[in-house]
């Protein structure tokens, strides 16, 4: 008779759920006030005109308009603004 001993247990086999981070509304897109523009960890993008920054660094529109991405300042920071139409 063929015999096989029981395999040992493992301590691996877990992973965290994906957090669905990233840009949700791209440059030139029209957004309404309250729309989420970017979900991020830390400030990869900074809040510009008519954009608010949430507790978890989520950027959201404070007014209706078009999304505008821009790089400015001495450190070449990326800013996101909402331009009224």
From Swiss-Prot:
Keywords for the protein's UniProt record, in alphabetical order: Ribonucleoprotein, Ribosomal protein
GO cellular component: cytosolic large ribosomal subunit
Gene that encodes it: rpmA
Species of provenance: Citrobacter koseri (strain ATCC BAA-895 / CDC 4225-83 / SGSC4696)
Xref: PROSITE patterns: RIBOSOMAL_L27
Similarity-based family: Belongs to the bacterial ribosomal protein bL27 family.
PANTHER family from the UniProt entry: LARGE RIBOSOMAL SUBUNIT PROTEIN BL27M, RIBOSOMAL PROTEIN L27
GO BP, one annotated term: translation
Family annotation (InterPro entries): Ribosomal_bL27, Ribosomal_bL27_CS
One of the record's GO molecular function terms: structural constituent of ribosome
Name of the protein in question: Large ribosomal subunit protein bL27
Segments of this protein annotated with the region Disordered: 1-20
């Amino acid at each position: 008779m063929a015999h096989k001993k029981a395999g040992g247990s493992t301590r691996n086999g877990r992973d965290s759920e994906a957090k669905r981070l990233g840009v949700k509304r791209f440059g030139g897109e029209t957004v309404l006030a309250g729309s989420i523009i970017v979900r991020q960890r830390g400030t990869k993008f900074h809040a510009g005109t008519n954009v608010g920054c949430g507790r978890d660094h989520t950027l959201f529109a404070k007014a209706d308009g078009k999304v505008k991405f821009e790089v400015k300042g001495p450190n070449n920071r990326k800013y996101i603004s909402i331009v009224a139409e």
